[in-house]
């Protein structure tokens, strides 16, 4: 692990953290009873991005990128942006305030939406990859 790699992850994490803060502030009005601002725009979007980018940028994907770019986006940016630790604390706060129903909704919605978002990101990028492979195969066949 080089200093450059650490720097790449650190910068991505800083940008992801700043984005998380800005989105959290903007989502405060809708987060009065259940922390929807954390669930939807942060954890679900971050999960979609990591699934989409991770699939689209594989070596055999439509847009392969360097390992450093994957580290920047997937570990740095998404790691700083998504907030599982915040989700856990918010859920514990709901439980400590005897809001078990709201805590249960928070857990279920977070898990279901985030796993669904990763799957949707993967499926969407896989469609891009498959389309790129078909286009490349058609072009190769036409050249032959």
From Swiss-Prot:
Residue sites binding Na(+) per the record: 79, 82
UniProt note on regulation of activity: Na(+) is not transported, but it plays an essential structural role and its presence is essential for fluoride channel function.
GO biological process, one term: cellular detoxification of fluoride
InterPro entries, A to Z: FluC (IPR003691)
GO cellular component: plasma membrane
Membrane topology: Multi-pass membrane protein
Molecular-function annotations in GO: fluoride channel activity; metal ion binding
A Pfam family assignment: CRCB
Family membership: Belongs to the fluoride channel Fluc/FEX (TC 1.A.43) family.
Biological function: Fluoride-specific ion channel. Important for reducing fluoride concentration in the cell, thus reducing its toxicity.
Classification via PANTHER family: FLUORIDE EXPORT PROTEIN 1-RELATED
Protein name (database record): Fluoride-specific ion channel FluC
Gene name in the database record: fluC
């Amino acid at each position: 692990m080089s200093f450059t790699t650490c720097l790449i992850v650190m910068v991505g994490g800083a940008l992801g953290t700043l984005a998380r803060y800005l989105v959290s502030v903007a989502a405060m009005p809708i987060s009065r009873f259940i922390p929807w601002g954390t669930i939807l725009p942060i954890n679900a979007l971050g999960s979609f991005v990591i699934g989409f980018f991770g699939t689209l940028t594989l070596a055999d994907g439509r847009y392969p990128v360097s390992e450093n770019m994957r580290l920047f986006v997937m570990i740095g940016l998404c790691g700083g942006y998504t907030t599982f630790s915040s989700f856990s604390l918010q859920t514990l706060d709901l439980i400590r305030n005897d809001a078990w129903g709201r805590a249960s909704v928070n857990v279920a919605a977070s898990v279901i939406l985030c796993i669904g978002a990763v799957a949707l990101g993967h499926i969407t990028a896989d469609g891009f990859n498959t389309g790129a492979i078909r286009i490349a195969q058609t072009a190769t066949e036409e050249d032959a």
